[in-house]
Swiss-Prot record:
There is a cross-link at K713 (Glycyl lysine isopeptide (Lys-Gly) (interchain with G-Cter in NEDD8)). Its main location: cytoplasm. Pathway: Protein modification; protein ubiquitination. Component of multiple Cul1-RING E3 ubiquitin-protein ligase complexes commonly known as SCF (SKP1-CUL1-F-box) complexes, consisting of cul1, skp1, pip1 and a variable F-box domain-containing protein as substrate-specific subunit. Binds to the pop1 homodimer, the pop2 homodimer and the pop1/pop2 heterodimer forming the SCF(pop1-pop2) complex. Interacts with pof3, pof14 and skp1. Core component of multiple cullin-RING-based SCF (SKP1-CUL1-F-box protein) E3 ubiquitin-protein ligase complexes, which mediate the ubiquitination of target proteins. The functional specificity of the SCF complex depends on the F-box protein as substrate recognition component. SCF(pop1-pop2) is required for the maintenance of ploidy and directs ubiquitination of cig2. This is Cullin-1. It comes from Schizosaccharomyces pombe (strain 972 / ATCC 24843). The gene is cul1. Keywords: Cell cycle, Cell division, Cytoplasm, Isopeptide bond, Ubl conjugation. It comes from the Eukaryota. Changing K713R: Loss of neddylation; results in impaired cell proliferation and marked stabilization of the cyclin-dependent kinase inhibitor rum1. Neddylated; enhancing the ubiquitin-ligase activity.
Amino acid sequence: MTTLNTNDKDLPIVKKYDSLNGTWDFLKTGVSQIFERLDEGMTITKYMELYTAIHNYCADASKTITVDNFNDQTANVLGEALYNNLVLYLEEYLARLRKECISQTNHEEQLAAYAKYWTRFTTSARFINHLFGYLNRYWVKLKNRFTETLVYDIYTLCLVSWHHHVFSHIRDSLLQNLLYMFTKKRLYEPTDMKYVEVCVDSITSLSFDKTDMTKPNLSSYKTFFETNFIENTKNFYAKESSEYLASHSITDYLKKAEIRLAEEEELVRLYLHESTLKPLLEATEDVLIAQHEEVLHNDFARMLDQNCSEDIIRMYRLMSRTPNGLQPLRQTFEEFVKRSGFAAVAKIVPQVGGEADVDPKEYMEMLLSTYKASKELVNTAFHGDTDFTKSLDTAFRELVNRNVVCQRSSSRSPELLAKYADSILRKSNKNVDIDDVEDCLSSIIIIFRYVEDKDVFQNFYTKLLAKRLVNGTSNSQDAESSMLSKLKEVCGFEYTSKLQRMFQDISLSQEITEAFWQLPQSRAGNIDFSALVLGTSFWPLSPNNVNFHLPEELVPLYEGFQNYYYSCHNGRKLSWLFHLSKGEIKARINPQTNVTYVFQVSTYQMGVLLLYNHRDSYTYEELAKITGLSTDFLTGILNIFLKAKVLLLGDNDKLGDPNSTYKINENFRMKKIRVQLNLPIRSEQKQESLETHKTIEEDRKLLLQSAIVRIMKARRTLKHVVLVKETIDQIKSRFTPKVSDIKQCIDMLIEKEYLERQGRDEYIYLA
């Protein structure tokens, strides 16, 4: 049957009844047909006759009533009698429906009966509401406007009547039946749920504001149904979860919990009001997850150790649903990163030599693999969670700065990182393809960000860069520039300013050399020559204490360049770094083969070999006297020559003895024409490392003192504790200072009269 729109001015002619009883008797047949025999249908003519009868009754009565004389008495004339007769009919009709519902003792049958009658009743109520539309528009509206008596529109009247005569009598059994059906559903028992949605919708529809139907009001639904439903849910899952955990693994339980939560969401979508979703899930999550958090958390470490990725992802998803579920996971993850990282680093420490002989490449690759695996876990399993990222940062900073390699010295990580960077940026690197250099540099910066003693890295990196530039062994200018840019991005311009100046010196040196080659004195001895003029303020290089005597073959070139430079730069002084200089010597020493070899040597080595143009044999004492080399340097050089069989040690002689003899090997043979003899001497490397660490300590003291002076100059007076804290805050981007070192620097500044102690724990700045 279709709802019709009527026009009050175009109604059919219908017999007018002189009395209320006559009108109601006619209307009642139609009302009862709509409520009780709706499936039989009703003709449009019949429907319009009923509508017209209501209109005529109200219209005739309203002829003597105006807005000015409308009151409770006149309202009765206008339409209240019809309204009251409808109320009585609904009471009688709904009493019969109530008996039908109560007579059903089976859970599903009662729900089916209730759902059937409710659906039929609400459909009929909509037609009745339209049928009494004139009464709604005039009498109900005026009644509510001009009297204190609340009158419902016809549809609301039907709902209120249902609530009073049906629902309020069977609500308890209806609730229990609904809860029973939901429990069966959760137990996966065969359940016909088609009536459940209708019954719940009935409860929702009956939860209205009787004073204003336009206002949303779910108070009855919430207090009567939702509260009991959620409590029933909690009881169900409390029992099930405890029993399931007792007989299944944590992995199985997590899967079960996810399935159950998804099922509860589906229950709401299919059968309940959408507002129930949030409190239902919160209650279910509390029972399934929060109340078992400790047991679940205890298994998380195992999942991480065994790399159970699916379990880890599922654990994170579930724990993220509870208020404090993720905090223990973050702590466990942090400990896992440290524990696994420490164990991985320990495996690469050589049994002989210990942490002192750790290979930089192997060490850095181990740290990187640990970081990348952990970062991948954060991105995939923890969805890039910022708190888990912080836990990773905390753990990895601990790993980088306090692993077994760093036990003796916290500066080992930055030192090894600088050496690894050097291996990537040097031409001799054979392990990294040129296309992968940029990726390697980015990986270095990843580790660098976690290094606490960035000043240590700076010192070692600067020294190694100096070697690459001096020896011409940089892999590429682009790679060097890229590395500087990355360091500047992390630490700022000041950190890389000296490094930038070193590259400028190399460019200027090329210009100086090219200009020198235009002069006649540059061709002295017909020797190819180039010089690097390096500023002492920027380069970590200094003359050694060796009184080296330059070979006579090189003296004219040496003097010619020095005179040229002084003529261009008056007032400057050149300090020659012969220990860093190198060259090539053509040698034809085997008369049988007559092969010309090219020896790549240091200037010190050159000073020794060129002597053999004059004699075939020298004693150790003679070599030392002629070259001016110290015992350590000369012994190291001769050892290299003896191993390469360029020189031969006299019979029964011992290396380093004053009278031991060293003869040129006229039978020297080598497959390669170019022979690299300029090899690092281990004692030099060890001494260099010690000197670097010494320089770092001295630089730190100066840095601390300058920071303290800056702070005190700005603050004038400070307590000891505050000064220490502010000093640490200023310096921590470069390294983590010890409190004892800060105190020592304060004492030094007091001695220098920059500061004065006032009382026991306060300092005054002295201008």
